[in-house]
Amino acid sequence: MGSAFDPLVTATEDLAAVNSAPPLSNLTQEELKKIAAYKAVEFVESGMVIGLGTGSTAKHAVARISELLREGKLKDIIGIPTSTTTHEQAVSLGIPLSDLDSHPVVDLSIDGADEVDPALNLVKGRGGSLLREKMIEGASKKFVVIVDESKLVKYIGGSGLAVPVEVVPFCCDFTRGKLEELFRDSGCVAKLRMKIGSNGEEAAPAVTDNRNYVVDLYLERDIGDLEVASEAILRFPGVVEHGMFLGMATTLIVAGKFGVTVKDRFG
């Protein structure tokens, strides 16, 4: 299938492309995000428990679900928000909400991603909600990931942007140093994420929804076996979770200049 995603699919011949729309070359990135989000909501059925994602793409899916509820095209939906930001959006739109304690099995989660590699491994959580996202999306029967084509990479960390790691505040610089050392061969630079004050200066460490800090890993080269890397990160005392979502996505929806492409992990 002719799409901008094709050059990256060398490692994913098992994936099935199930749909492609006409070219969208004149649309903005924000419009592409909205198109991908609306396509994902086509997977939602009445009576489902839905994981509501976080971020600039997922917000369009949340808004679309609300719209369909108001129109009566969806009924009896329960949303499980992945962040306080999404919780606030869903409440404002009148979507009924719950949590994993009350609904431990989620029928479908819809969320964006910061990076997607050819095997549908993801980087998520650059917005700081990675722990809640991973808990809810890990409890989901299906996990639909929605991106525009700018998020497609050849390897995790390949965009040059951060792979986030949530850490406890206690001795966070010690943890930061250990993480940097772990991936030194990949040219890793680990930085504690800081909030920017009103004067444009770094004011204080950025805090997650769970009152933890974030260490951002910037990688110059591929870190190799992702499962090995994941286990190594999580072995460090002080690490809460990382933003690599490995083998979790069941469907990828990509909106790009060649149209909308849906790829299913299991064909």
Swiss-Prot record:
Its EC number is 5.3.1.6. The keyword Isomerase applies. It is an enzyme of class 5 (isomerase). It is found in: Cytoplasm. GO terms for molecular function: ribose-5-phosphate isomerase activity. The lineage of its organism: Eukaryota, Viridiplantae, Streptophyta, Embryophyta, Tracheophyta. This is Probable ribose-5-phosphate isomerase 1. PANTHER family: RIBOSE-5-PHOSPHATE ISOMERASE 1-RELATED, RIBOSE-5-PHOSPHATE ISOMERASE 3, CHLOROPLASTIC-RELATED. CDD domains: RPI_A. Expressed in roots, cotyledons, leaves and flowers. GO terms for biological process: cellulose biosynthetic process; pentose-phosphate shunt, non-oxidative branch; uridine biosynthetic process. The modification Phosphoserine is found at residue 92. The keyword Acetylation applies. The modification N-acetylglycine is found at residue 2. Keywords: Acetylation, Cytoplasm, Isomerase, Phosphoprotein. One of its GO terms (cellular component) is cytoplasm. It comes from Arabidopsis thaliana. Catalyzes the reversible conversion of ribose-5-phosphate to ribulose 5-phosphate. Its main location: cytoplasm. NCBIfam families: PRK00702.1, rpiA. Disruption phenotype: No visible phenotype under normal growth conditions (permissive temperature of 21 degrees Celsius), but mutant plants have a temperature-sensitive phenotype (when transferred to 31 degrees Celsius) showing radially swollen roots and reduction in cellulose production. Belongs to the ribose 5-phosphate isomerase family.
